[in-house]
A protein has these predicted regions:
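Short glycine-rich or small-residue beta-strand-to-loop segments that form or flank ligand, phosphate
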Residues: 82-88
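Conserved "HGTGT" condensation-loop signature of ketosynthase/thiolase-family condensing enzymes
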Residues: 1-81, 103-105
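Conserved beta-strand segments that form the floor/walls of ligand-binding pockets within enzyme
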Residues: 10, 84, 115
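A generic secondary-structure signal
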Residues: 68-72, 129-133, 143
């Protein structure tokens, strides 16, 4: 396993927002047998999940969490240099959700924004990218959109 070490970088604040609707895993008997549900809960420990309403996007949850940070800490919108949005459920295919959040939060147009399409490991991957962004004096970026008929 690679060992990554970052100096002089830290996390100043963490906020979380979760949807209000709770679905118990044991209530999914219309989709899975009781035996399958028991095995799933035993293997994962997931006894319930939170589900957003149909009109709630991933950016809505991020916006609420970001507002908590701005309202409850000394971190100011104008201090934000980069915004990383990580999800496997972006608001739209295009434009990127990070740009939507940048605008909705009133961040500077100079703020660098990134969308990272990942699931479970996305948070760690995003931390790695943010730390690298803060430590490296230069960066190389490739992008490609192979348009096909």
């Amino acid at each position: 396993m690679a060992l990554l070490k970052f100096n002089n970088i830290g996390i100043k604040a963490i906020a979380a927002t979760v949807p209000h609707r709770v679905i118990k895993t044991t209530s999914l008997t219309d989709y899975y047998s009781s035996e399958e549900i028991e095995k799933f809960v035993a293997a994962t420990g997931v006894e319930e999940r939170r589900f957003a309403a149909p009109d709630v996007c991933a950016s809505d949850l991020c916006y609420q969490a970001a507002c908590q940070i701005f309202d409850e800490t000394d971190i100011r919108r104008e201090d934000i240099d980069a915004l990383f949005f990580i999800s496997q459920s972006p608001d739209y295919k295009i434009p990127g959700t990070s740009g939507i959040l940048q605008n909705k939060l009133g961040l500077s147009k100079e703020t660098i924004v990134y969308d990272i399409n990942m699931s479970c490991s996305g948070f760690i991957h995003g931390l790695l990218m943010a730390y690298n962004f803060l430590q490296q004096p230069s960066c190389l970026l490739y992008t490609s959109e192979p348009t096909r008929l």
